[in-house]
A protein has these predicted regions:
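Basic, Lys/Arg-enriched alpha-helical interface segments
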Residues: 1-78, 86-94, 100-126
């Protein structure tokens, strides 16, 4: 199952108020583990920054979808697709569905379909 395991990376507390917590699905965790430690650390750092600031260079909504894209450019265009879970009273979660290396200007339809499938499974089995 996609959501059998989750990895929640501890983000150090910053002075600003955290707007959401990032949760990485098994697929996203697997993607991160395949990367170099430098790329992985940059992605996790940018996810932490995005949770405290509104920066469309880091985290932006994909037009016409319920998905968001976390962008990291480090020689390659790393992307994590994500969706919001606002059903908890205390924490707002952003679930990183999976990651990929972007090779074109547009986000490939197959990656959007994959994220939508993971999102559907997440809310069905939650």
């Amino acid at each position: 199952e996609t959501f059998a395991t989750f990895a929640v990376f501890n983000h150090k507390h910053m002075e600003a108020k955290e707007r959401f917590k990032v949760v990485y699905s098994a697929d996203a965790t697997e993607f991160l583990q395949r990367l170099t430690s430098k790329a992985r650390e940059k992605i996790i750092s940018n996810a932490r920054k995005a949770s405290y600031t509104i920066d469309p260079k880091l985290f932006k909504k994909l037009t016409g979808t319920d998905l968001w894209e976390l962008e990291i450019n480090d020689g390659k265009q790393y992307r994590l697709l994500a969706f919001w879970d606002k059903t908890k009273e205390v924490d707002t979660l952003v679930i990183a569905s999976h990651g990929f290396i972007k090779k074109t200007d547009k986000t490939p339809a197959k990656e959007i379909e994959r994220a939508n499938k993971i999102m559907k499974e997440y809310f069905e089995f939650k």
